[in-house]
From Swiss-Prot:
InterPro entries reported in the protein's UniProt record: EGF-like_Ca-bd_dom, EGF-like_dom, EGF-type_Asp/Asn_hydroxyl_site, EGF_Ca-bd_CS, GAIN_B, GAIN_dom_sf, GPCR_2-like_7TM, GPCR_2_ADGRE2_ADGRE5
Domain statement: The first two EGF domains mediate the interaction with DAF. A third tandemly arranged EGF domain is necessary for the structural integrity of the binding region.
Site (Cleavage): 530-531
Extracellular side: 21-552, 602-620, 675-691, 761-766
This protein's encoding gene: ADGRE5
Record's protein name: Adhesion G protein-coupled receptor E5
Record: glycosylation sites: 33, 38, 108, 203, 371, 406, 413, 453, 520
PTM text: Proteolytically cleaved into 2 subunits, an extracellular alpha subunit and a seven-transmembrane subunit.
Localization per Swiss-Prot or TrEMBL: Cell membrane
Complex and partners: Forms a heterodimer, consisting of a large extracellular region (alpha subunit) non-covalently linked to a seven-transmembrane moiety (beta subunit). Interacts with complement decay-accelerating factor (DAF). The largest isoform (isoform 1) interacts with chondroitin sulfate.
First and last residue of the signal peptide: 1-20
GPS, as annotated region: 495-543
Modification Phosphoserine occurs at: 815, 818, 831, 833
Source species taxonomy: Eukaryota, Metazoa, Chordata, Craniata, Vertebrata
Length: 835
C-alpha cells in the first residue's frame, strides 16, 4: 500500500501545473479556463464545463459551452443571430438588419434593437440599367422594367424583349410589329393605312390596303397598266406590249413597247421563190399589225399558211431534209406569233376556222390552279391552269391549239426516231431486229402552246385527244371517219411529236408521250412536254431472215438459170430465129431486173434520194420491157397461126424498137408527170401516192389481157385446123406446141406479178413469200421450158458434152445424126421450136 502511494506522488510531480501548495492553501494544478477552490480542488470558469463540477485531478479539462446550440437557452430576439464566443456568446443583427442603438452586439432579447436596412436607398446602383431595386426584409431584389428581361448570365442585368419575334404582341394581322427598346408598336405596312377611326401605332391599330391605282398614287409608265396588289401595286405591260430589253415586267419601273413579229426568213441555204414570197407576206403583216387588230392578224397569218400548204410550188421539189427543216421553222414561228397575238385578245375563249379547215382555239384567263378543258373539232386538251401560267409572265395565262390538216408536202417521208428503250422492247416482242419504220399520219398536226415557251418538262402532264382523219393516200385528209383505226400485224398506234433535228431538219419522236386508249375515232395521249403532235400508225420493218435467205438463194439460182438461157439462145444455132430473139431479150430483161432487185431494192436510211429513185426507175423499165417482149411473143404466135399464110412476122429491128422503146416511153412520161413517184422510204419501188403504181400496173394488165386474147384466138384457130384434113398437120403440131409454151410462160410471169403488185403492202407477208418463191422460179422455169424441153437444144448440149469428153465420140455421134438433123433443119422454119 505504501508503494502505490509513493508511485502516484511521483507521477503528480511530473505533471504540468503541479506545484507545491502555496502558503494560502490553493491548488496550483487547475486546468485552463478553471479557478482554484482549495488546495485539492478546482472549478471551471463560467461559460465552460467539465466532466464533474469539481475538478480533483489535473487530467480533467474545461470545455467551452455553446450557448447558441439548439436547444438554446439564449433568446436574442427577432432579426438577430446568436454567435458563440470563448466562454460566452453575443447576439448580433442578421444580415440586412442593423441595431438602432448603434451597439454591435447584445446579450438578450431585451437589448435587441435590430431593424431592416434599406439597401436600395443605401446603394441606388445595385440594379443595373433597365432594372429597379426593390427592398425586402433583410435583403433586396432587382426587377426589370416592362419590355425587358434578365439575361441568363446575370440576374441583375436586363435586356430588351423583342415582342415582335417572341409572339408577345397583340398586333392585328393587317399591321406590322415594330420593336422599340422596352416596347413595340403596331404600325401599318407600306401600302396600307389605318382604317377610319383607328390610330397608327398602338396595339389596337387595324389597317387596310391602299389602292394606289385608283387613288393616283402610283408611278406607272404610260405604256403599262397599274394593278393593285395587297400592300403595293405593279406596272404591267398593256395587252399586246412587251417589256423593253433588260427591263422586267410587273415592276414599278416597268417600261413597255409594242410587240412585233420575229423576222421570218427561209432557212439558211434554202432557195425557194414560193417560200420567200410567203415570208415576205408574213413580214408585211407584222409591220402593219396593231394590238387592236390582233384577231384580224391571226386570221391573215392562218390564211397565208393555208395558201402555202395548198400550193407549195417549188417547195415540193426540195429534198426531204430541207422540207422537214421548213416544217420545223414554220411550226415554231406559228407558235410564237399565236402566243404574242393571243395576249392582245380579250379574256375568254377564242376560235377561228379557216376555209381550209385549219383551226385555232385559244383560252385566255387569269392565273389559277384548276383543271381546264378546251377543245375543237380535231383535238381536245385537259391541263392544270397553273401549268399554263408559268412563272415568267404575270399577266393572264394563255393556252392554244393550232390544228393544221394539210401538211402532207412538208412532212412527207418523215422518219420516226426510236429511242434505245423502245427499240429494245420491239426487238424483244418480235424476236428480231427492227430495220425501219413506215409511218402513216392519222390526224392533223396539232401545235400546242402556252403563255410561256418553257414547256420541255412540265410540272404535271397534259391529256390530249386527237381525232382521226380520213386518209386515202397515206396522209391525213380532212373528214373524220366513222370507224376506229385498228393496228394490224407489226403495227402500233403512236402519239408522236415533231422534234427539231440538225441532220434531217426534223423527225417524229415519242419520248415523254404515251397512248392511253383509242375509241370513237380518236386517240387519247398523255405527254409531259409540249410540241406539235400527231397520231401515227407505225408499221415496223422487222427483219425476216427466212425471207431474206429465200430471196438471196432463190434469185441467185434464177440469175444462174437466166444466164444459161441467154448463153443457149446466143450459141445454139438450130433454134435461131425471131422467137428465139424474143426469148433472148426477155431473159436479158429479167436478168438485169433481178440483179438490180437483189442489189438495190432496200432503201437504207428511209430517205428517198437519187440512188433510190434511179433503182426504182430501172426496175420499172426492166420489168415493163420483160412484159413487152412477152407481148411480142404473143404477136409472133398471131402471125404464125392466125396469119400463117401471110408473111413471116416482125423483123428484129421492129422487135427491138417495140420491146425497148415502148417501156422507155412509159417510164419517161411517168417520170415527167410525177418524178417523186419513184422510191419509197422502205423500198426503192413505185410509190402508191396519186395512183402512180398504175404506170406499171396499167401496161402490165393491158399486156396480159392482150396476150390472153391472142392465145384464146390461137387455140380456137388451131382447133379449127385440127378438125380439118390439113396437109400442113406437122406445122400445126409445132404451132400447138409453141402456143402451149407461150401460155405456160404467160401464166408463170403473170401470176408472179399479180402477187408482186402487192408485195409492198404493210400486211402482205404471205404475198411476199409467194412472190419471192415464184420470182425465184422464173429463171428455172424459163430454162426448163425453152432449153431442157427443147429437143434441138438437148442435141446441142449432147454435142457440146461429147466435144468436151473427146473428139472420137463426137465424130461418131455427128455421123449417125447428121442425116436426120439436116432433114429436120430443112423441114422447119428458122423460127420454129423443136419440142
Amino acid at each position: 500500500m505504501g508503494g502505490r502511494v509513493f508511485l502516484a506522488f511521483c507521477v503528480w510531480l511530473t505533471l504540468p501545473g503541479a506545484e507545491t501548495q502555496d502558503s494560502r492553501g490553493c491548488a496550483r494544478w487547475c486546468p485552463q479556463n478553471s479557478s482554484c477552490v482549495n488546495a485539492t480542488a478546482c472549478r471551471c470558469n463560467p461559460g465552460f464545463s467539465s466532466f464533474s463540477e469539481i475538478i480533483t485531478t489535473p487530467t480533467e479539462t474545461c470545455d467551452d459551452i455553446n450557448e447558441c446550440a439548439t436547444p438554446s437557452k439564449v433568446s436574442c430576439g427577432k432579426f438577430s443571430d446568436c454567435w458563440n464566443t470563448e466562454g460566452s456568446y453575443d447576439c448580433v443583427c442578421s444580415p440586412g438588419y442593423e441595431p438602432v442603438s448603434g451597439a454591435k452586439t447584445f446579450k438578450n432579447e431585451s437589448e435587441n434593437t435590430c431593424q431592416d436596412v434599406d439597401e436600395c436607398q443605401q446603394n441606388p446602383r445595385l440594379c443595373k440599367s433597365y432594372g429597379t431595386c426593390v427592398n425586402t426584409l433583410g435583403s433586396y431584389t432587382c426587377q426589370c422594367l416592362p419590355g425587358f428581361k434578365f439575361i441568363p448570365e446575370d440576374p441583375k442585368v436586363c435586356t430588351d424583349v423583342n415582342e415582335c419575334t417572341s409572339g408577345q404582341n397583340p398586333c392585328h394581322s393587317s399591321t406590322h410589329c415594330l420593336n422599340n427598346v422596352g416596347s413595340y408598336q403596331c404600325r401599318c405596312r407600306p401600302g396600307w393605312q389605318p382604317i377610319p377611326g383607328s390610330p397608327n401605332g398602338p396595339n389596337n391599330t387595324v389597317c387596310e390596303d391602299v389602292d394606289e391605282c385608283s387613288s393616283g398614287q402610283h408611278q406607272c409608265d404610260s405604256s403599262t397598266v397599274c394593278f393593285n396588289t395587297v400592300g403595293s401595286y405593279s406596272c404591267r405591260c398593256r395587252p399586246g406590249w412587251k417589256p423593253r430589253h433588260g427591263i422586267p415586267n410587273n415592276q414599278k419601273d416597268t417600261v413597255c413597247e409594242d410587240m412585233t413579229f420575229s423576222t421570218w426568213t427561209p432557212p439558211p441555204g434554202v432557195h425557194s421563190q414560193t417560200l420567200s414570197r410567203f415570208f415576205d407576206k408574213v413580214q408585211d403583216l407584222g409591220r402593219d399589225s396593231k394590238t387592236s387588230s390582233a384577231e384580224v392578224t391571226i386570221q391573215n397569218v392562218i390564211k397565208l399558211v393555208d395558201e402555202l400548204m395548198e400550193a407549195p410550188g417549188d417547195v415540193e421539189a426540195l429534198a426531204p431534209p430541207v422540207r422537214h427543216l421548213i416544217a420545223t421553222q414554220l411550226l415554231s414561228n406559228l407558235e410564237d406569233i399565236m402566243r404574242i397575238l393571243a395576249k392582245s385578245l380579250p379574256k375568254g375563249p377564242f376560235t377561228y376556222i379557216s376555209p381550209s379547215n385549219t383551226e385555232l382555239t385559244l383560252m385566255i384567263q387569269e392565273r389559277g390552279d384548276k383543271n381546264v378543258t378546251m377543245g375543237q373539232s380535231s383535238a381536245r386538251m385537259k391541263l392544270n391552269w397553273a401549268v399554263a401560267a408559268g412563272a415568267e409572265d404575270p399577266g393572264p395565262a394563255v393556252a392554244g391549239i393550232l390544228s393544221i390538216q394539210n401538211m402532207t408536202t412538208l412532212l412527207a417521208n418523215a422518219s420516226l426516231n426510236l429511242h434505245s428503250k423502245k427499240q429494245a422492247e420491239l426487238e424483244e416482242i418480235y424476236e428480231s431486229s427492227i430495220r425501219g419504220v413506215q409511218l402513216r399520219r392519222l390526224s392533223a398536226v396539232n401545235s400546242i402552246f402556252l403563255s410561256h415557251n418553257n414547256t420541255k418538262e412540265l410540272n404535271s402532264p397534259i391529256l390530249f385527244a386527237f381525232s382521226h382523219l380520213e386518209s386515202s393516200d397515206g396522209e391525213a385528209g380532212r373528214d373524220p371517219p366513222a370507224k376506229d383505226v385498228m393496228p394490224g400485224p407489226r403495227q402500233e398506234l403512236l402519239c408522236a411529236f415533231w422534234k427539231s433535228d440538225s441532220d434531217r431538219g426534223g423527225h417524229w419522236a415519242t419520248e415523254g408521250c404515251q397512248v392511253l386508249g383509242s375509241k370513237n375515232g380518236s386517240t387519247t395521249c398523255q405527254c409531259s412536254h409540249l410540241s406539235s403532235f400527231a397520231i401515227l400508225m407505225a408499221h415496223y420493218d422487222v427483219e425476216d431472215w427466212k425471207l431474206t435467205l429465200i430471196t438471196r438463194v432463190g434469185l441467185a439460182l434464177s440469175l444462174f438459170c437466166l444466164l444459161l438461157c441467154i448463153l443457149t439462145f446466143l450459141l445454139v444455132r438450130p433454134i435461131q430465129g425471131s422467137r428465139t430473139t424474143i426469148h433472148l431479150h426477155l431473159c436479158i430483161c429479167l436478168f438485169v431486173g433481178s440483179t438490180i432487185f437483189l442489189a438495190g431494192i432496200e432503201n437504207e436510211g428511209g430517205q428517198v434520194g437519187l440512188r433510190c429513185r434511179l433503182v426504182a426507175g430501172l426496175l420499172h423499165y426492166c420489168f415493163l420491157a420483160a412484159f413487152c417482149w412477152m407481148s411480142l411473143e404473143g404477136l409472133e404466135l398471131y402471125f404464125l397461126v392466125v396469119r400463117v399464110f401471110q408473111g413471116q412476122g416482125l423483123s428484129t429491128r421492129w422487135l427491138c424498137l417495140i420491146g425497148y422503146g415502148v417501156p422507155l416511153l412509159i417510164v419517161g412520161v411517168s417520170a415527167a408527170i410525177y418524178s417523186k413517184g419513184y422510191g419509197r422510204p422502205r423500198y426503192c419501188w413505185l410509190d402508191f401516192e396519186q395512183g402512180f403504181l398504175w404506170s406499171f400496173l396499167g401496161p402490165v394488165t393491158f399486156i396480159i389481157l392482150c396476150n390472153a386474147v391472142i392465145f384464146v384466138t390461137t387455140v380456137w384457130k388451131l382447133t379449127q385446123k385440127f378438125s380439118e384434113i390439113n396437109p400442113d398437120m406437122k406445122k400445126l403440131k409445132k404451132a400447138r406446141a409453141l402456143t402451149i409454151t407461150a401460155i405456160a410462160q404467160l401464166f408463170l410471169l403473170g401470176c408472179t406479178w399479180v402477187f408482186g403488185l402487192f408485195i409492198f403492202d404493210d400486211r402482205s407477208l404471205v404475198l411476199t413469200y409467194v412472190f419471192t418463191i415464184l420470182n425465184c422460179l422464173q429463171g428455172a422455169f424459163l430454162y426448163l421450158l425453152h432449153c431442157l424441153l427443147n429437143k434441138k437444144v438437148r442435141e446441142e448440149y449432147r454435142k457440146w458434152a461429147c466435144l468436151v469428153a473427146g473428139g472420137s465420140k463426137y465424130s461418131e455421134f455427128t455421123s449417125t445424126t447428121s442425116g436426120t438433123g439436116h432433114n429436120q433443119t430443112r423441114a422447119l422454119r428458122a423460127s420454129e421450136s423443136g419440142i
